[in-house]
């Protein structure tokens, strides 16, 4: 089956489009095989194809050889004819010079070819074309770049004596490494986008870096085996436990406490050392702030006598009367009073008949009845004047619309230097200087000696209620 596929793929077609399609389909089928199997199949077909040529064609006439040479030259020229854009190559007229070879028709060569079954002979010579098509698709470095998981030894290269003995094999090897047919196939545009040319599976992809034969045949030494073992910990190590024999896989284990350690009393020296150190006053003053932004020169100063005096809370004045309580006392007479029937009647809510305050007589009458005298009465001029709506002042301006045109002067105005100066924010001292001012609570000596007046002393007294 594999030979038939290679033969079908290598057979030349006279139609250019058909040839391109058959070459692409066969290339995709061939590339699906691993590169190792392709190399082995190629060498096997090389040996099988050369043996029948030696045994079956010992006395091949010169006419058949010349005809084969012409066929090979035509096959080599076919890739140039397959390109459609090259219009000047279509009328290739120099081939008319081969017409005199048709004079060999009257000779007995056709009978000899028919007697020797030339079609079967041509079929035996067909693998040479398939080998040319397949070997040009193989990579030149296929003998070196082999997956180590499939084979440990590289396939043997053809010997020089074998290549020198057979000139056909020499040409085959040259065509294999030159890859003349593979290059034009790769230069053609893709027929279908998005579909890969071949499927990737284990063994047919080439490694990034070729693996050397020495690395594949390397033997493990005793030194490497010893270095591969995990590092052991000495038996004199303090945590001498089973899980500490090897450095990997350590666990957090609580140490066992002996019973004498539980009932032992610490000495006075240990108790004194266990107490936290007491900071001296000078150490606290010299200690810098925990905040890195504060300067080291700033220190906490001792409070002045004035600050200590102000820190004492003020006492309550003896004449101070607190605010009146919200609770009101009710007298006993009010609690023991009895309501009269009239008060009880007035305490009830007003009962509405059908949701109205008054009874309705006719539907056209208003809800509240109007007395006849009010309906006959005539309003006075004062009542008529008050009934009219208040007129708008003569200087009244209605509300301006939300959209109004902006004047030309407003749109093209420029800020004066004075306005720009006023627009700048006020320059103030930095916050850090004001915040960390050590003299912020310092009082002037004159303010400490000042005496308040009689009026100020009276205003400072709380209100007497």
Curated annotation (Swiss-Prot):
Residues 40-70, 114-137 have a biased composition (Basic and acidic residues). Transmembrane segments: none annotated. InterPro entries: SPMAP2-like, THEG. Pfam families: THEG. Keywords: Repeat. Residues 1-140 are annotated as: Disordered. The keyword Repeat applies. Residues 1-29 have a biased composition (Polar residues). THEG repeats lie at residues 174-192, 214-233, 260-279, 297-316, 333-352, 373-392, 409-428, 446-465. PANTHER family: TESTICULAR HAPLOID EXPRESSED GENE PROTEIN (PTHR15901), TESTICULAR HAPLOID EXPRESSED GENE PROTEIN-LIKE (PTHR15901:SF15). This is Sperm microtubule associated protein 2-like. The gene is SPMAP2L.
């Amino acid at each position: 089956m594999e030979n038939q596929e290679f033969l079908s793929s290598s057979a030349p077609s006279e139609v250019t489009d058909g040839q391109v399609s058959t070459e692409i389909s066969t290339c995709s089928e061939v590339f699906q095989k691993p590169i190792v199997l392709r190399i082995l199949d190629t060498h096997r077909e090389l040996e099988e194809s050369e043996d029948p040529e030696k045994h079956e064609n010992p006395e091949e006439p010169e006419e058949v050889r010349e005809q084969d040479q012409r066929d090979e030259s035509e096959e080599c020229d076919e890739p140039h004819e397959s390109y459609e854009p090259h219009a000047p190559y279509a009328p290739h007229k120099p081939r008319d010079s081969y017409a005199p070879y048709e004079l060999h028709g009257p000779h007995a060569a056709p009978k000899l070819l028919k007697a020797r079954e030339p079609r079967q002979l041509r079929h035996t010579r067909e693998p040479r074309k398939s080998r040319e098509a397949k070997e040009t698709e193989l990579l030149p470095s296929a003998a070196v770049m082999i997956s180590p998981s499939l084979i440990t030894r590289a396939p043997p290269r053809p010997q020089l004596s074998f290549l020198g003995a057979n000139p056909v094999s020499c040409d085959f090897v040259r065509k294999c490494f030159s890859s003349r047919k593979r290059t034009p196939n790769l230069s053609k545009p893709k027929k279908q986008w998005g579909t890969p040319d071949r499927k990737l599976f284990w063994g047919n992809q080439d490694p990034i870096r070729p693996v050397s034969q020495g690395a594949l045949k390397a033997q493990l030494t005793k030194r490497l085996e010893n270095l591969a073992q995990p590092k052991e910990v000495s038996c004199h190590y303090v945590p001498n436990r089973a899980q500490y024999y090897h450095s990997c896989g350590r666990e957090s284990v609580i140490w066992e406490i002996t019973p004498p350690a539980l009932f032992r009393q610490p000495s006075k020296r240990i108790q004194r050392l266990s107490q936290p150190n007491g900071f001296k006053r000078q150490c606290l003053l010299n200690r810098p702030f925990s905040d890195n932004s504060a300067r080291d020169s700033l220190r906490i100063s001792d409070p002045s006598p004035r600050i200590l005096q102000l820190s004492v809370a003020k006492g309550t004045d003896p004449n101070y009367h607190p605010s009146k309580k919200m609770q009101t006392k009710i007298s006993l007479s009010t609690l023991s009073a009895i309501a009269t029937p009239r008060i009880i009647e007035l305490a009830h809510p007003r009962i509405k008949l059908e949701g109205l305050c008054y009874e309705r007589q006719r539907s056209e009458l208003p809800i509240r009845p109007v007395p006849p005298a009010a309906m006959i009465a005539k309003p006075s001029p004062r009542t008529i004047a008050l009934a009219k709506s208040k007129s708008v002042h003569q200087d009244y301006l209605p509300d301006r619309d939300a959209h109004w045109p902006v004047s030309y002067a407003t749109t093209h105005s420029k800020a004066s230097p004075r306005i720009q100066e006023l627009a700048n924010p006020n320059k103030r001292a930095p916050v850090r200087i004001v915040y960390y001012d050590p003299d912020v609570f310092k009082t002037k000596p004159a303010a400490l000696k000042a005496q308040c007046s009689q009026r100020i002393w009276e205003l400072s007294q709380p209100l007497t209620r």
